Amino acid sequence: MLDAPSAPAAGLQIETGSPVIRLTRLRLLDGAPMLAEEIWLPYDRFAPLATLELDAFGDLLYPLYESHCGQIIASAEETLTAEAVNATYARLLRIQPGDPVMVIERVARGYDRVPLEWRRSRGAAAHFRYHVDIR
């Protein structure tokens, strides 16, 4: 359990300093890092995850949220931006500090529209592809 920094708190619509759970993941494709993720969850809704063994976490988190915490993600909104990567994320993504990365910020909500998850994912811009189907 951590105190929520300002950006995750704003995304989750909770007070800065409120108790949260922070998950970090490195998403791989054929052994190469594609995305470095930080995921923030309000502690009061996701407390069972704080004591869960690491091997219980799979690739898909939303089914885990439902089965262990009773929280169902109904929708999500994403914002894409670009930035120069810092040394920490450069090391994780195996790129050089200052290289461009795409940043995806996601707010996932329950059926009641209350934010349940705030996520920030970073991936090397060289590997990034965006596709949208507009009808």
PLM regions and their residue ranges:
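All-alpha effector-binding/dimerization core of bacterial HTH-type transcriptional repressors
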Residues: 1-135
